[in-house]
Amino acid sequence: MPGGEGENRVGEGIQSLKQLHALPWDEKTENEMLRSRLDEQSQLICMLKQRADETQIKWQHLERVNGELERQSGEAAQRFQSERERGERLEERFAILASNHQQMIRFKDEYKQQNEELRQLCDTMRESKYPELLHRDRCIQELRDQLGDTETRLKEQEMNYGRKLDTLSAKVEQLEGEKRTGSLELGDLTHRLKVSEETRHEAQEKLARLEEIKKAEKAEADKRLEEIKKEKQELLNLCMERGRTLQDRQREAAELSVRLQEAQKSLEKAEESYQRDKAAVDADIRVSDLQRKLEDGENQFEQLRRDFEAYKKHSGDLLTKERELNSKLRHLIG
């Protein structure tokens, strides 16, 4: 029974060594993981560049809007100046019409004064001597006739002047209406110009704020870019360090593989020696020797397994650190 149990344990140890030796080393997967992470870094840098381009496009659009507002402000100022000149011309024409109206009033007053003087002259002539009065009556009659003609002409002229005055009054009212309309238009244009100035001032303030925001975003983007470059350099250093560590681990794995092969050969030799010496040596002593060798082989196998687990843990720590760096880069970009 002890001999059969020893043979089973030797067979199980050999089978475990064969399974460990058959474990694959996937270097291609590791290279693809490294390449995938480098691609992620390139995508993050492209996203930063795209945001910088979008900020530049917004800045150009605001410059075009500011130029359009300045053009509209200039046009409003020109219209305001034109309406102001038109109002001044209307005021000049109104002053001329008012002066003509005053002249017509003075002419009418002068006519009334002359008429009154003629009447007084007639009364004075009546109080003179009779012959002279008769003579003067004739003269007065003639003068009356002349006065009638003159009055008729004056009435005609007064009517003409009245019509002209009505026409001029209508024109004056029209000009006053135009002046009021011009004043309203001038007030509207003044209000629109004021609104345009306020809009332009607000646009300039907004543009100044956007310039400050752009400068701040540019500084922040430069700062983030520097941080990303620093993180990228650290990542590259980490990748290089990991590559060197990977090469060391590959070399260690190769050494472990050689040691596993040697251990397997030792176990195979032990099994062959056990088979050769099985018939000649006492079974219990040989089994004890084989058990000791098997325990040595198991101890070597356990040591190799612990080394392999330590390597896997170190690789996992490197991968976790790399993921944390990628998450930090995404947080900076986002």
Swiss-Prot record:
Residues 75-318 form a coiled coil. Keywords: Coiled coil, Cytoplasm, Nucleus. The keyword Repeat does not apply. One of its GO terms (cellular component) is cytoplasm. InterPro entries: CCDC89-like. Its main location: cytoplasm. One of its GO terms (molecular function) is protein heterodimerization activity. In adults, expressed at varying levels in different organs including the liver and brain, with highest expression in the testis. Disulfide bonds: none annotated. It is found in: Cytoplasm; Nucleus. Belongs to the CCDC89 family. Interacts (via C-terminus) with hey1/bc8 (via Orange domain). This is Coiled-coil domain-containing protein 89. It comes from Xenopus laevis (African clawed frog). The lineage of its organism: Eukaryota, Metazoa, Chordata, Craniata, Vertebrata. The gene is ccdc89.
